[in-house]
């Protein structure tokens, strides 16, 4: 789990997301509170529950981007889901319980990777010995039995040196590695998930312990053997328990598009993917126990962050019980032309930086002047005002139009230096800057 302070988390988010200080502060405090809670002693630790967050704001202002960046910072089990993908229990479609199952699978991968890294040094040594055994098969005695290998022979040490220096990387060898598990996906009828999990485990156990001969280059064989040896050093039952603990204590669920499951108007028919889904979400958010193939998972201390544009519906259209379980509300503001200017230049891997790097692969040096950045931002802002406001995503459309000619001709422009200034932008985006013909920029 991340031990970053709220100020450090906000600073990290600032490198990728412009503005939205309130939203950044809210998620930073929530993430830090996860760490604070773990410093408490029982039984007080059990009593401290997470304060779930509802982020409200128009499309394209950074709600989903905050979730993406948070996933990298959290160093904890994290899953982002779309609320519209789920249906009420009893109908065809995904049930909300699958969120926790997917989160547990994510935790298994995270914990497994951590354990592999812990054992990597030992696994590398064992993999190296296996490669050397293949290159220098141990001798057999007069009865055909393999003699105990001597790891310190001169020949073996010479080969070990060559192996570590990469001199043998392109040589092909045949090795025995564990056969991959049979991946079987079974769609379970409602209420029969436990049987499905047992069937999946049965199919996976069919291939466990089996090995497969594969021919590959030594550099690829080493990677495969390191993973193979590291997997042998991991206790599967201990891994499951660590993953379940990680989900229960540090898990974070980000539910996007929650406004799309709000009930609109007085509609009395079956509400399979709206109010029914909200009611199914209630026990998860409040705290319940979900059966997964790795074991039972309690959701009492999982942090839920929901977000939605709420352009048609309002937060008050959510059922009251769910509103009460999302106590922290953060409003994200619409982006201005000044924000667009900052988005084009300030974040790590900004749009202008991306296009410069792409054109550099063709030997073309691109330079954006301040006036060009200002004109691009104004053009994107104007299109958003006159048509559908899709926030920062509009910049992608405008930039593609601006760079269209250069991108097409770049392969014949090697060695050239192109300066994109205000006049160039006006010429390329003239139909939006002067004539306000916006049809080219509507997605």
UniProtKB/Swiss-Prot annotation:
Gene3D superfamilies xrefs: 1.10.8.60, DNA helicase RuvA subunit, C-terminal domain (1.10.8.10), P-loop containing nucleotide triphosphate hydrolases (3.40.50.300)
Q: What main location does UniProt list?
A: cytoplasm
Q: Which Pfam families match?
A: AAA, AAA_2, ClpB_D2-small
Chain residues that bind ATP: 18, 60-65, 256, 321, 393
Question: What top-level branch of life does the organism fall under?
Answer: Bacteria
Gene Ontology cellular-component terms for this entry are:
HslUV protease complex
Places the protein is found:
Cytoplasm
Q: Which GO terms describe its biological process?
A: protein unfolding; proteolysis involved in protein catabolic process
Alphabetically list the UniProt keywords: ATP-binding, Chaperone, Cytoplasm, Nucleotide-binding
- Give one GO molecular function term: ATP binding
Q: Which family does it belong to?
A: Belongs to the ClpX chaperone family. HslU subfamily.
Q: What does this protein do?
A: ATPase subunit of a proteasome-like degradation complex; this subunit has chaperone activity. The binding of ATP and its subsequent hydrolysis by HslU are essential for unfolding of protein substrates subsequently hydrolyzed by HslV. HslU recognizes the N-terminal part of its protein substrates and unfolds these before they are guided to HslV for hydrolysis.
Subunit: A double ring-shaped homohexamer of HslV is capped on each side by a ring-shaped HslU homohexamer. The assembly of the HslU/HslV complex is dependent on binding of ATP.
The protein in question is named ATP-dependent protease ATPase subunit HslU
Source species: Histophilus somni (strain 129Pt)
The taxonomic lineage of its organism, from the top, reads: Bacteria, Pseudomonadati, Pseudomonadota, Gammaproteobacteria, Pasteurellales
